[in-house]
């Protein structure tokens, strides 16, 4: 189980992110892509955590290498869901994934999302994919 103090910090961060997005005019009725961030020094640990997150119903990105300011090499991936911008829904994901990260020996580094313009035209070609086409795939728009 994740440290309760760390969870409370993450819950406060969730409230802050949502509040800032809505204050900036992001669409309160949109479905958002929520990117939870995992990292680890050991690729195998990260991979095992990613597999477990996938089993829980999340999409998972490929691992990428990141060098910290202290020159430590970390392997990172995003654990992705779609959700309304609601504190309780996102905090339930935060708790689930922070607990998983603790169990698997990886870091849960919070979450992020993107601004959703309420005035943007609906994309009729949208096929509800979480990920855009690969660079070598033809674009439909």
UniProtKB/Swiss-Prot annotation:
Gene3D superfamilies: RraB-like
GO cellular component, one term: cytoplasm
Record's keyword annotation contains Cytoplasm: yes
ATP-binding keyword on record: no
Biased composition (Acidic residues): 119-141
Region Disordered, annotated ranges: 112-141
Domain of life of the native organism: Bacteria
GO molecular function per UniProt: endoribonuclease inhibitor activity; enzyme binding
Keywords: Cytoplasm
Protein location: Cytoplasm
Subunit structure: Interacts with the C-terminal region of Rne.
NCBIfam families (UniProt xref): PRK11191.1 (NF008393)
Similarity comment: Belongs to the RraB family.
HAMAP family registered for this protein in UniProt: RraB
Function of the molecule: Globally modulates RNA abundance by binding to RNase E (Rne) and regulating its endonucleolytic activity. Can modulate Rne action in a substrate-dependent manner by altering the composition of the degradosome.
Name of the protein: Regulator of ribonuclease activity B
Species this chain originates from: Xenorhabdus nematophila (strain ATCC 19061 / DSM 3370 / CCUG 14189 / LMG 1036 / NCIMB 9965 / AN6)
Gene that encodes the chain: rraB
